[in-house]
């Protein structure tokens, strides 16, 4: 061993276990514009000081391990370590606190959501010194944002492609989600689109099953799109789910969709994975396809209030990885959602610059610079009587995605789609005339019923 690499016991190195807070708790640290900042909700084991547990989170999600190692002396820990720089109690929760951690940007590969999450949440959530841990928010610095392509096209480009302005877009998920033949599936798509919807959608678990192979579904849906476009004079689309068992197969399906000339494909970004999603997003940008994102499996990650990851973090990650639409909850439908919190991450999806606002769950000011925005998709358990609230809450830059609220119409799919479109246009017209949708919404819908099925 050369003199330059030889390490002797007792010379600059002392083996053994020491408290994390001695190295990783730095309340005097001033965060840098280039740091990735994280807010963790920590529930420690009894008797452990918050400073030690906050420092443990910073250590185990960056450079630390359970003991001092001699290779620590071969690098600069002060340059690369995560730092717990602030701790605050959670109101109403005696055993929880928020630990703020700063990570140097050099810890992360450029343009890789996969690497970012592997570092920040990949290991520390199984740490036995913690009873529970939840990542509430991330601040992504501009320097890191600029390494991502982001959404394939964004809100304005999508509107230009569709030639549709001044209102939310309307969609419908085809039901039953499983069991239809490709031909019957295409018929259902056609009926919805000719009735007035902008989009129809594959359900998240429609891939390529024995009862309906993907290529057959793509062909019959493309036929439905072109036929409904010819009848209505509007541009239509169907979210063709390209999610597959391999990235190669996924791209093959997207290529076929492009060859058919349809405007949009779909991906289940959590079950498919961020690497696959980013690859598909790049393909869609290069080939003029819009990309609809479904968040299947999100509740496994974000449902618990004290463990896992809040959806606002997944929403930020999706904007970085790439998608033109993403499901965001409804506030008024059958799934969980708090209005202010939901609107907080809706703003994080759509806006260029979002100020810190703890009442809306936004822990950090976020600057997206030139990264395109993502349309939030309100879906699950909604129907025409929710239209006034949805129009008021989500505004024009959104997709209102019905299912049973269209297909459950007693006269069939096309009349259900007509009812959706009439209700939406009535609400938009009333809003533009200055009427209060929150107060007069029911009356507006009743008036619209006079000229709608």
From Swiss-Prot:
SUPFAM superfamilies per the UniProt record, alphabetical: RuBisCo, C-terminal domain, RuBisCO, large subunit, small (N-terminal) domain
EC class (word): lyase
Post-translational modification, as annotated: The disulfide bond which can form in the large chain dimeric partners within the hexadecamer appears to be associated with oxidative stress and protein turnover.
Keyword Nucleotide-binding: no
Modified residues (N-acetylproline): 3
Recorded superkingdom: Eukaryota
CDD domains on file: RuBisCO_large_I
Binding site for substrate: 123, 173, 177, 295, 327, 379
Residue sites binding Mg(2+) per the record: 201, 203-204
Other facts: The basic functional RuBisCO is composed of a large chain homodimer in a 'head-to-tail' conformation. In form I RuBisCO this homodimer is arranged in a barrel-like tetramer with the small subunits forming a tetrameric 'cap' on each end of the 'barrel'.
Subunit structure as annotated in this protein's UniProt entry: Heterohexadecamer of 8 large chains and 8 small chains; disulfide-linked. The disulfide link is formed within the large subunit homodimers.
Name of the protein this chain belongs to: Ribulose bisphosphate carboxylase large chain
Species classification: Eukaryota, Viridiplantae, Streptophyta, Embryophyta, Tracheophyta
